[in-house]
Amino acid sequence: MDIKACYQNAQALLEGHFLLSSGFHSNYYLQSAKVLEDPKLAEQLALELAKQIQEAHLNIECVCSPAIGGILAGYELARALGVRFIFTERVDNTMTLRRGFEVKKNEKILVCEDIITTGKSAMECAKVLEEKGAQIVAFGALANRGICKRAHSHLKAQEGACLPSHLPLFALEDFVFDMHKPSSCPLCATSVAIKPGSRGN
């Protein structure tokens, strides 16, 4: 499956000057919500991702996503894997498990995002689950922006990667775009970064 074509066809590969939820600026933005608004395509992508995970022979009992961006991807992945799904969300800027969701002691959980940039949100989600006794066994995403090391990719982890090196990150593709710290962003000379993502919006 050509993941880049899926994003392009859904008009979900945006070009401009963007402020990512990680804090970096970039000339490209992946709007996964546009891809996932098609239920059949969402199912196909999740099945492809589930195949990678199943081939690794991991014991996964639950998928958890940080709201809002990861919810659709996580739910479809959980359905493809045949396990339950829960999500964490921010309350007063602190990631929290609410809505009656519970985790069992040593429950094996995969944390799923739509896009992984630095993995900061995924790690906030993982920390909440670990504090409640769960065991994080892997991370997943539809796409990886190339900062974190993806399983089966030749690319190495880059500066700013937050995910632990001993746990696998499963994603369908690496999307490697230029990213800049706000203090050294060349795009800021001609335009103001816009924030199309879900954190804070």
UniProtKB/Swiss-Prot annotation:
Sites where the protein binds 5-phospho-alpha-D-ribose 1-diphosphate: E113, D114, I115, I116, T117, T118, G119, K120, S121
Gene Ontology molecular function terms on file: magnesium ion binding; orotate phosphoribosyltransferase activity
Pfam families in UniProt: Pribosyltran
One GO BP: pyrimidine nucleobase biosynthetic process
Residues binding orotate, per UniProt: T117, R145
Pathway(s) of this molecule: Pyrimidine metabolism; UMP biosynthesis via de novo pathway; UMP from orotate: step 1/2
Subunit structure: Homodimer.
PANTHER family: OROTATE PHOSPHORIBOSYLTRANSFERASE (PTHR19278), URIDINE 5'-MONOPHOSPHATE SYNTHASE (PTHR19278:SF9)
HAMAP family: PyrE
Protein name (database record): Orotate phosphoribosyltransferase
